[in-house]
Amino acid sequence: MKRMIALDGAQGEGGGQILRSALSLSMITGQPFTITGIRAGRAKPGLLRQHLTAVKAAAEICRATVEGAELGSQRLVFRPGTVRGGDYRFAIGSAGSCTLVLQTVLPALWFADGPSRVEVSGGTDNPSAPPADFIRRVLEPLLAKIGVHQQTTLLRHGFYPAGGGVVATEVSPVASFNSLQLGERGNIVQMRGEVLLAGVPRHVAEREIATLAASFSLHEQAVHSLPRDQGPGNTVSLEVESENITERFFVVGEKRVSAEVVAAQLVKEVKRYLASPAAVGEYLADQLVLPMALAGTGEFTVAHPSCHLLTNIAVVERFLPVRFGLIETDGVTRVSIE
């Protein structure tokens, strides 16, 4: 019997990433774990609907036995079984993030006995989670370089707080992992601004695009008007395509916040990324830790290692026989497998 790994949910940033990473790694390695203090660092601690959906999805895919899988629970025991490929559907029942549920279960399906399709309904444009377009246009091309073949499709948008969105991913077992080397971003090739609207006046998008264009030379500007029943909602994105990597940044519009202020938040975030020669943005860095650890090799550079990133690394090192090295030089941190 494999040893039970004990995790403290309050460590590091004290959020849901500890649980999601632990679920992924437990499914992959077959190691059971117990976690206490789930989301202890949040205003509303314990399992919310999206976290509970991730737990139940993981349990279904690997036929795990679980204790503590209920709303508000701050303690969970997870004993995994064998990961099985198949056609899975999960409903969050709120505007909780579809992509964070997918992020939990997809890595395990890289090791399944056959191809899989996973469909999740809930929120797709959530201020605290990567949207589906980030997964499709930024993460999945990098995963392909590592040897992971998965394809995410956004079937219907679901804005916070209403939800109602649907995201599906098709994934195949990985034959072998490759090393990802992202030391340098390279020169910028082009920048693209994009606005999504649902039940929001078009002039909002025009003002947001104008704010982006005042700070950056945009090679493309796009406004996509969605059916009103998918809203109300508004998301502004800016994609930076460089020689070695494409990064995408986004801000979700809020009620009583002007279009100019929303877009200015995005401008600030992109300028912070471009001010450093680091290849990877803060949020993408979190997503690369697990696949890089599974490959057992690779490196990337990031301007500042976030608490989220450091917490994720700590959890990965509990489950896998790898060690990460972080070396800071001239304001850039190089993250690599030692």
Curated annotation (Swiss-Prot):
UniProt keyword list: ATP-binding, Cytoplasm, Ligase, Nucleotide-binding
Identification of the protein by name: RNA 3'-terminal phosphate cyclase
This enzyme's EC code(s): 6.5.1.4
Gene transcribed to yield this protein: rtcA
GO CC terms: cytoplasm
NCBIfam families, per database record: PRK04204.1-2 (NF003246), PRK04204.1-3 (NF003247), RNA_3prim_cycl (TIGR03399)
Keyword Ligase set for record: yes
Alphabetical list of PANTHER family matching this protein: RNA 3' TERMINAL PHOSPHATE CYCLASE, RNA 3'-TERMINAL PHOSPHATE CYCLASE
Catalytic residues of the enzyme: H308
Family to which this protein belongs: Belongs to the RNA 3'-terminal cyclase family. Type 1 subfamily.
Compartments (UniProt record): Cytoplasm
Class of enzymatic activity (EC top level): ligase
Coiled-coil stretches: none
An example Gene Ontology biological process: RNA processing
Pfam families on file: RTC, RTC_insert
Cited InterPro entries: RNA3'-term_phos_cycl_insert, RNA3'_phos_cyclase_dom, RNA3'_phos_cyclase_dom_sf, RNA3'_term_phos_cyc, RNA3'_term_phos_cyc_type_1, RNA3'_term_phos_cycl-like_CS, RNA3'P_cycl/enolpyr_Trfase_a/b, RPTC_insert
Lineage: Bacteria, Pseudomonadati, Pseudomonadota, Gammaproteobacteria, Enterobacterales
MF (Gene Ontology): ATP binding; RNA-3'-phosphate cyclase activity
Function: Catalyzes the conversion of 3'-phosphate to a 2',3'-cyclic phosphodiester at the end of RNA. The mechanism of action of the enzyme occurs in 3 steps: (A) adenylation of the enzyme by ATP; (B) transfer of adenylate to an RNA-N3'P to produce RNA-N3'PP5'A; (C) and attack of the adjacent 2'-hydroxyl on the 3'-phosphorus in the diester linkage to produce the cyclic end product. The biological role of this enzyme is unknown but it is likely to function in some aspects of cellular RNA processing.
Reaction equation(s) it catalyzes: a 3'-end 3'-phospho-ribonucleotide-RNA + ATP = a 3'-end 2',3'-cyclophospho-ribonucleotide-RNA + AMP + diphosphate
Superkingdom per UniProt: Bacteria
Binding annotation for ATP: Q103, Y283, L284, A285, D286, Q287
